[in-house]
From Swiss-Prot:
Catalyzes the N-acylation of UDP-3-O-acylglucosamine using 3-hydroxyacyl-ACP as the acyl donor. Is involved in the biosynthesis of lipid A, a phosphorylated glycolipid that anchors the lipopolysaccharide to the outer membrane of the cell. CDD domains: LbH_LpxD. PANTHER family: UDP-3-O-ACYLGLUCOSAMINE N-ACYLTRANSFERASE (PTHR43378), UDP-3-O-ACYLGLUCOSAMINE N-ACYLTRANSFERASE 1, MITOCHONDRIAL-RELATED (PTHR43378:SF2). GO terms for biological process: lipid A biosynthetic process. Pfam families: Hexapep (PF00132), LpxD (PF04613). Pathway: Bacterial outer membrane biogenesis; LPS lipid A biosynthesis. It comes from Neisseria meningitidis serogroup C (strain 053442). InterPro entries: Hexapep (IPR001451), Hexapep_transf_CS (IPR018357), LpxD (IPR007691), Trimer_LpxA-like_sf (IPR011004), UDP_GlcNAc_AcTrfase_non-rep (IPR020573). Its EC number is 2.3.1.191. The gene is lpxD. It is an enzyme of class 2 (transferase). Gene3D superfamilies: 1.20.5.170, Hexapeptide repeat proteins (2.160.10.10), MurE/MurF, N-terminal domain (3.40.1390.10). This is UDP-3-O-acylglucosamine N-acyltransferase. The lineage of its organism: Bacteria, Pseudomonadati, Pseudomonadota, Betaproteobacteria, Neisseriales. It catalyses: a UDP-3-O-[(3R)-3-hydroxyacyl]-alpha-D-glucosamine + a (3R)-hydroxyacyl-[ACP] = a UDP-2-N,3-O-bis[(3R)-3-hydroxyacyl]-alpha-D-glucosamine + holo-[ACP] + H(+).
Length: 348
C-alpha cells in the first residue's frame, strides 16, 4: 500500500492549527526518538523540549507556549498537541470502510436484514431476525445471534460474539474475543445447590462505544446492562449484569465491575480496579489502578486511589510512603512500649 502524504499546509487546512517553517510533506507520525525527515512527531509535555532538539523529525506538533526556542524547525502549533497528534495519526490511518458482500462460507439466516453495503466475513454468522445498519463489518468467525439490532458502521472483529437480543449503536467497535450479552452471574441458593436465575435482559451499547479484546459485558437479569455513548473499555474487562455505565467513560484493562453498579459519565477507571456490587460512582470520578472500590462515590470529580480500601488520592499518597517502613516502625513501637512498661515497674 502506498503511504499517504500530506504537506503541513494540507494538515492545518483540515485540522486547524498554524504551520511554521517550510511546507514539507510527511508520510507518518513517529515518536521524537524514532522520527526521520519524512515524519511528523509531537511534544505533549514541554519538559521534554530537549528531545525535540535531538530529533530528526521533519516537523513537530507543539503548543504555542512551547514553540519558542525552535527557530529553524518545521512546526505545527496547536492548542492541544496530543489531541492534534491523534487527529494527524487518523489522517494516515483512516477508518476502513465496509466492502459490500457476503463471503460464501458465512451463514446469514433468511429472516435477517443485511444491507448490500455490509461486509460479512468468512464463517461469520448472522442470526434470525437480526437487523444490521448500513456499512457494518462482521469479520471472520464473528457471531451475531438472533434478534439483535446493530447501527450503521458497526465493526465486529474476528471471533467477537454478540448474544441474542442485544442492541449496538452506530460506529460501535467490538474487538476479537469479546463477548457481549452472555448470561450474568445470577444464582439463588436452594439449600444444597445453586439454582440459576434466568437472565432475561440484554445489553445496550450507545453510539461510538469501543470494547477491547476478551472483554465480557453480561446481559441484565431483568433489564438491560447499558453502556453510554462514546465510552471506551479496554481488553480483559468484566462488566457484571445490570450495570449502567454513562457516556464518555474510559475503563482500563483487567478491571472487574460487579453486578448492578452504576458508573457516571466522563469517569476514568484505571487498570485492575475491582468494585463491590450495587454501588454508584459519580460523574467525572478518577480511580487509580488497582483500587478496591468498596462503597459508593457520591461526589463528582473525586480522584481516588489505593491498593488498600479506597481513600482519596491525597490520603493514599500521604500514607503510601510509610508502607515500606511498617516493620521498622513496629519494632520501634514495641521498644517504646517495653520502655514505658519498664519505667512503670521502676516507679512502683
Amino acid at each position: 500500500m502506498i503511504p499517504a502524504t500530506y504537506t503541513l499546509s494540507q494538515i492545518t487546512a483540515q485540522l486547524g492549527g498554524e504551520w511554521r517553517g517550510e511546507d514539507i510533506s510527511v508520510t507518518a507520525v513517529r515518536p521524537l526518538a524514532d522520527a526521520q525527515a519524512e515524519h511528523i512527531s509531537f511534544l505533549a509535555n514541554p519538559k521534554y523540549k530537549a528531545e525535540v532538539h535531538d530529533s530528526s523529525a521533519g516537523a513537530v506538533i507543539v503548543s504555542a507556549k512551547a514553540a519558542d526556542g525552535f527557530e529553524g524547525r518545521n512546526l505545527i502549533v496547536a492548542d492541544d498537541p496530543y489531541l492534534y497528534f491523534a487527529k494527524v495519526a487518523r489522517l494516515f490511518s483512516p477508518v476502513v470502510k465496509a466492502r459490500g458482500g457476503i463471503h460464501p462460507t458465512a451463514v446469514v439466516e433468511p429472516s435477517a436484514t443485511v444491507p448490500a453495503s455490509c461486509e460479512i466475513g468468512a464463517n461469520a454468522y448472522i442470526g434470525a431476525n437480526t437487523v444490521l445498519g448500513e456499512g457494518c463489518r462482521i469479520l471472520a468467525n464473528a457471531v451475531v445471534q438472533h434478534d439483535c439490532k446493530l447501527g450503521d458502521e458497526v465493526v465486529l472483529h474476528p471471533n467477537a460474539v454478540v448474544y441474542y437480543g442485544c442492541t449496538l449503536g452506530r460506529r460501535v467497535e467490538i474487538h476479537s474475543g469479546a463477548v457481549i450479552g452472555a448470561d450474568g452471574f445470577g444464582l439463588a441458593f436452594a439449600g444444597d445447590s445453586w439454582f440459576k436465575i434466568p437472565q432475561t435482559g440484554a445489553v445496550t451499547l450507545g453510539d461510538d462505544v469501543e470494547i477491547g479484546s476478551n472483554t465480557n459485558i453480561d446481559r441484565g437479569a431483568m433489564s438491560d446492562t447499558t453502556v453510554g455513548n462514546g465510552t471506551k473499555i479496554d481488553n480483559q474487562v468484566q462488566i457484571g449484569h445490570n450495570c449502567k455505565i454513562g457516556s464518555h467513560t474510559v475503563i482500563a484493562a483487567k478491571t472487574g465491575i460487579s453486578g448492578s453498579v452504576t458508573i457516571g459519565s466522563y469517569c476514568i477507571i484505571g487498570g485492575g480496579v475491582g468494585t463491590v456490587g450495587h454501588i454508584e460512582i459519580a460523574d467525572k470520578t478518577t480511580i487509580g489502578g488497582g483500587t478496591s472500590v468498596t462503597h459508593s462515590i457520591t461526589e463528582s470529580g473525586k480522584h481516588l486511589a489505593g491498593i488498600f480500601p479506597m481513600s482519596t488520592h491525597k490520603e493514599w499518597a500521604r500514607n503510601a510512603v510509610y508502607i515500606h517502613r511498617l516493620s521498622e516502625m513496629n519494632k520501634r513501637l514495641k521498644t517504646l512500649e517495653q520502655q514505658l512498661s519498664d519505667a512503670g515497674q521502676d516507679s512502683k
